[in-house]
UniProtKB/Swiss-Prot annotation:
It comes from the Viruses. One of its GO terms (biological process) is symbiont-mediated suppression of host autophagy. This is Matrix protein 2. Forms a proton-selective ion channel that is necessary for the efficient release of the viral genome during virus entry. After attaching to the cell surface, the virion enters the cell by endocytosis. Acidification of the endosome triggers M2 ion channel activity. Belongs to the influenza viruses matrix protein M2 family. It is found in: Virion membrane; Host apical cell membrane. The chain crosses the membrane at residues 23-43.
Length: 97
């Protein structure tokens, strides 16, 4: 039984459930919307990093290299990699006595 169709009414013997007809179009529409909402919420929680990263940065993975010579592409790749690499020369070693 769906929670949308279940109604509890007091009787002499206690609480009893009287369910309305489940073929009511409004009940069917509400059930379908509820199920779709649940599915979308689950998918959102499972894939939120991927979804929002795509919305934030777009579908492109980087600047377009169309029409750029291969030597310039390689130079750009090296610049990007060197920006990511950590240079140990910038850190000072401090020894405590």
């Amino acid at each position: 039984m769906s929670l949308l169709t279940e109604v509890e009414t007091p009787t002499r013997n206690g609480w009893e459930c009287k369910c309305s007809d489940s073929s009511d179009p409004l009940v069917i529409a509400a059930s379908i919307i509820g199920i779709l909402h649940l599915i979308l919420w689950i998918l959102d929680r499972l894939f939120f990093k991927c979804i929002y990263r795509r919305l934030k940065y777009g579908l492109k993975r980087g600047p377009s290299t169309e029409g750029v010579p291969e030597s310039m592409r390689e130079e750009y790749r090296q610049e990007q990699q060197s920006a990511v690499d950590v240079d140990d020369g910038h850190f000072a070693n401090i020894e405590l006595e």
